[in-house]
Amino acid sequence: MAASIFTGAVRAASGIFRPLNVLASSTYRNCARNACLNSSLCTIHFRHIQTSVVSSAPRLVTSVGHLAYGHTTTVLNRVATLVPSVLKPPVRALTYCSTRKGKRKTVKSVVHRFLRLHSGLWLRRKAGYKKKLWKKSTARKKRLREFVFCSKTQSKLLDKMTTSFWKRRNWYAGDPYQMYHDRTNLRV
């Protein structure tokens, strides 16, 4: 009952999901053809198929490719390009980790590109302040050279990418940002 409702919903969906229907039916046919008589072996065989569908895309191509003799692999590659977010979850390599103890390491480009105030705010230049200056007006170039604050999400991300060494208070002689390190008139 539930399988027929699911199949009807898949058929009613747009053309993007039609190759998935072909993939599921051909995989089911091949599994039924190669089904073993022992029930414990059958559950192991089908459990392997279920885990491979949930796994990432490269392993999915290799495991289903053994079952389907080439046709399913081409369909899967076609679907993987159309729906990348279903097969590959988004991953951002934000931090570096040391090989010995697994501690987080600082991403050096963050230290070079951004300035962290002691209050936790991050300063950056506007995007594109070095690019294609020949076609930008003088006023626009001046606006792009200005420093702006990073948003809350960006600040949290940058804090993850740096260690506590870069979050300590520094007392530089003649620091132009000395008066901005502490937030005043801030009600918490």
Curated annotation (Swiss-Prot):
Q: Which Gene3D superfamilies match?
A: 4.10.410.60
Similarity comment text for this entry? Belongs to the bacterial ribosomal protein bL35 family.
Q: Which UniProt keywords are given for this protein, alphabetically ordered?
A: Mitochondrion, Ribonucleoprotein, Ribosomal protein, Transit peptide
The name this protein carries in UniProt is Large ribosomal subunit protein bL35m
Per the UniProt record, the lineage of the source organism begins with: Eukaryota, Metazoa, Chordata, Craniata, Vertebrata
Molecular function terms from GO: structural constituent of ribosome
Report disulfide bridges, numbered on this chain: none
Does the keyword Mitochondrion belong to this entry?
yes
Q: Record's InterPro entries?
A: Ribosomal_bL35-like, Ribosomal_bL35_sf, Ribosomal_bL35m
Sorted alphabetically, the Gene Ontology cellular component annotations on this record are: mitochondrial inner membrane; mitochondrial large ribosomal subunit; mitochondrion
Quick check: keyword Transit peptide in the entry? yes
Compartments where found: Mitochondrion
Gene Ontology biological process terms from the UniProt entry:
mitochondrial translation
